[in-house]
Each structure stands twice: as structure tokens, then as C-alpha cells.
Amino acid sequence: MRRVGQSPSAPVSRVIRTGTKGSAGRLAFGPVDDRVYVGYAGKDAVADRGWLLGHFKDAGDPRHSEAVEIKWSVHPRADARAEWVRGEERTALLVLISGRFRVELPGRSVLLEEQGDYVVWGRGVDHSWFAEEESVVLTVRWPSVPGYAVAAEGGAGPRA
């Protein structure tokens, strides 16, 4: 499989999968070389609580970024954020991949119910969320802020 404009001699990387679509038999590839990483979000996300890309990846990893963080989240029905995120330092984009997902913002509730629905909120906007159905969402945050994490109890803030 070649993309338009790609040299016929250029190597093609594929994610190797075993089993059938949706089965647990998928295998994530790893680094192809020091500048390319091929993976499977459903498996790779487990390593960093859903985060696929950001400052927290090793500096030599192509998924390391000081500018942006990307998260793949699978939420069971009725999953809810334990506490509101307050004092957020980043801008965020949340895109619904599947399901039905509600984002709570001060004075406003946003329901994402069709694939591709999204919401963006800026720095300093408090937020919370609730999965009305089993949902898969992709979150992009910027900048990637070192020392910021969700505490085990569900609150968010700088790491001690």
C-alpha cells in the first residue's frame, strides 16, 4: 500500500494484528526507528493511564512532546470524573470516537453524541465529565505541563 506522492521504494510500516477485529489478539508495534513509532492506542494507552504522547515519554521516544499531550480513553457506561478539575493550566480538545459522553463546564453541559463531536475549552476553565454510554474519546491538551497529574483519589493538580 502506497500513499500518493510516496516513492515506490519507500518501506511501508503496518501494525501487525492477530485474531479478528475487536479481539484481544492485536499487537502494538514499537519503534520502527528512532523517529517513527507505530502502535495501537487501545494497548499503548494502558502504559500511561491513557496518555499516548507528551512530556512524560522518554526524550528519545518519537511520542515525547513538550508542546502537546494526547490521550486515548475508554470509559464504561456511567463512568464519571470523581471531582471537577480546577485551575487547569492547558487548553483542551476532546473528540468523541464512539458512545455518548457529557462534558460539564461552568454554567454549561455539552453532550457529545455523534462520532466526531468535539468540545474545546481554554486555560482556566474548570471541567468534569460523565460517560452516558460506553465511550471512547481522544483528548488533546496543550502545552504538555510537567508535574501535573490526576491524583489517585481523582483530583487534579501539580505532582508533589
Model feature map: region roles:
Residues 1-77, 81-84, 157-160:
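A short, N-terminal "cap"/entry segment at the start of jelly-roll beta-barrel domains
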Residues 123-148:
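Ligand-binding loop in jelly-roll beta-barrel domains
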Residues 86-102:
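Short, conserved beta-strand element in jelly-roll/cupin
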Residues 144-160:
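Short peripheral tails and domain-boundary helices/loops at the edges of structured domains
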Residues 61-64, 81-88, 105, 111, ...:
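Short histidine-centered beta-strand/loop micro-motifs
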